[in-house]
Structure formats: C-alpha cells, structure tokens
C-alpha cells in the first residue's frame, strides 16, 4: 500500500483504512499431505471462494477468500509441523489470521479410522516434529470444541465408523502469536483420501464457533485423552492444552504457566487414575501457587453439565 502523502485528507485516510487487510480464520492446506488436500477439495466444493493476489516473494502457492468474507484458504508446499512464524508470514503477505486451522493427516501405529482435533506444543525438549523445546502454541478451546462436536455429529449422521477424539498437546508449530489448532483425518492413506471423511472435516471447520466456553487444562490419560474427550462432549466445557501421563515428568511451573496463559484456563482437570501420586502432588502444588483450582469430573459435570 502506498503511504498517504496527505495525512490531513480524510478521503485518503478512509481509502487506506479500507485497504488494510482484516484478520480472518485461516485454513492452511499442505501440498504433500493427502488428508489436507482431501479437506481442501471438499472446502472448495462446499462454498464459493475467490482467488486472492499474493506477493510473488511470499512462501504461499495460492490463497483464496470465502465469498462471505469469514475464511481464507492458504496453500503451502511444506508440511504443517515446521510452520513456526507462519502468522508473521501471513501478515507480511497481506493475509493476517485471527485463527489458524491446520487441515492435516493423522498417523498412528494402530491405523484407527479417526477424526481428531488438538493444539500444538512440545512439553519436553524433543523437537523432531517442529516447534521449540518446552514451548506451547496459543490454543483455541472454543474452536476445538465446536469442530470436534460437529465432526462427531456429522460422522454419526453419515454412519462413518470413525473415532472422533481430542488429542493431547504435541508437535509443532509452537511459535505462533495467534490461536491455532489441528483438524485431522487418520490414520492411513485409505482414510486420508476418503471423501466422506474429508467432507465431515471440511464442514466441521466451516461451522467453527468462537463463542467463549469454560476452559480446562488437562493432565494425565493417554494420547487420545479419552476422559477429557468425554467431558468435552458431555458438558459445556472445553480443553486447551493437555499433557498425557507419559509427559508429566517434563511438566514444571514454567510449562504449566504457559498452558494456563495460552489456554486462558478457568480450572484444571486430572485424569487421576492414570497419574502417579507424586505427579498429582507436584502438579497440584504448582497449580495452587499459580491460583488455579483443580475440579474433579463429578464437579465439572455438576457445574457445567448439559
């Protein structure tokens, strides 16, 4: 945009303001990711999009905006997990984001058909899958809840035999200043290319809601956070960051403080039976020092039950 040569000219100022790109919910699709391309195809079929001009020197291969102005759809040539700083790159390309949704594949050894949602971060020093050590991305609990609930509703409506579940915090990117989440199809090439699953994921993304809900940070359980998932579906709450039992040894005050701040958490939840007594005591003490209460499942259901 050219600078306003006459700052006293209201008409010129109004023109500049109107040309300032507005942050949008931004869906990121990766070229080498089969599930991402499946979801992209469904998104393009479901609603009308217009192609956007992007700078030649940007790292994006294409960008579109929905006709209603709510979403942008941006193509990248790389994998999602190594996209630290993506928010700044989007802004520099004139595509600022208010929320980043990574449309992605999910891979598991069990090869379970699944639709999953999670936020990103590295509780330990392991950064093989992107991000920085002991760093968490800003989560979007309301968006995660709405997408997961809609995935479940649509999958049941279609009779799809897919597990719909919340995953714990894992992998990159971590260095993003705007909220983000992953919406995924798993867990093999068969599911990644399944158009029915792609349609469910795409429709759920387009139905995303940012209406505030009570938020917990979670501790314990396995990778698929089964008890947290049940609470998300069966009560009015959502979860921000979740740390599974096999990562609790790395959880310290600095990480918990990050999780609270980057989830805007109202309380904490323990999957108690999965946690060692010393882990519960350690984390309880940290939470007490930080002023965050721990609610039991029965208390959550009583206070926030649907």
Curated annotation (Swiss-Prot):
Binds 2 Zn(2+) ions per subunit. Belongs to the DtdA deacylase family. Its cofactor is Zn(2+). One of its GO terms (molecular function) is zinc ion binding. Keywords: Hydrolase, Metal-binding, Zinc. GO terms for biological process: D-amino acid catabolic process. It catalyses: a D-aminoacyl-tRNA + H2O = a tRNA + a D-alpha-amino acid + H(+); glycyl-tRNA(Ala) + H2O = tRNA(Ala) + glycine + H(+). The gene is dtdA. D-aminoacyl-tRNA deacylase with broad substrate specificity. By recycling D-aminoacyl-tRNA to D-amino acids and free tRNA molecules, this enzyme counteracts the toxicity associated with the formation of D-aminoacyl-tRNA entities in vivo. This is D-aminoacyl-tRNA deacylase. Monomer. Its EC number is 3.1.1.96.
């Amino acid at each position: 945009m050219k600078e306003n040569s006459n700052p006293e000219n209201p008409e010129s100022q109004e023109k500049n303001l109107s040309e300032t790109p507005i942050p949008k919910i931004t869906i990121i699709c990766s070229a080498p990711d089969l599930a991402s391309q499946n979801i992209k195809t469904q998104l393009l079929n479901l609603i009308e999009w217009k192609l956007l001009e992007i700078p030649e020197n940007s790292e994006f291969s294409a960008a579109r905006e929905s006709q209603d102005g709510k979403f942008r759809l941006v193509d990248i040539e790389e994998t999602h997990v190594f996209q630290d700083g993506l928010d700044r790159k989007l802004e520099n390309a004139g595509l600022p984001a208010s929320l980043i949704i990574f449309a992605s594949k999910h891979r598991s050894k069990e090869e379970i058909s699944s639709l999953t949602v999670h936020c990103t971060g590295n509780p330990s020093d392991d950064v093989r899958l992107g991000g920085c050590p002991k760093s968490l991305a800003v989560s979007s609990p309301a968006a995660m809840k709405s997408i997961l609930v809609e995935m479940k509703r649509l999958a049941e409506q279609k009779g799809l035999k897919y597990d719909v579940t919340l995953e714990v915090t894992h992998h990159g990117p971590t260095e993003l200043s705007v909220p983000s989440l992953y919406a995924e199809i798993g867990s093999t090439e068969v599911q990644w290319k399944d158009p029915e699953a792609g349609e469910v994921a795409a429709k759920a993304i387009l139905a995303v809601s940012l209406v505030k809900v009570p938020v917990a940070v979670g501790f314990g359980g396995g990778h698929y956070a089964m008890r947290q998932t049940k609470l998300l579906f069966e009560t009015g709450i959502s979860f921000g960051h979740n740390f599974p039992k096999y990562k609790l040894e790395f959880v310290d005050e600095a990480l918990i403080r990050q999780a609270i701040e980057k989830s805007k958490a109202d309380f904490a939840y323990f999957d108690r039976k999965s946690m060692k007594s010393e882990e519960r005591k350690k984390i309880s003490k940290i939470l007490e020092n930080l002023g965050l209460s721990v609610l039991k499942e029965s208390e959550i259901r009583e206070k926030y039950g649907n």
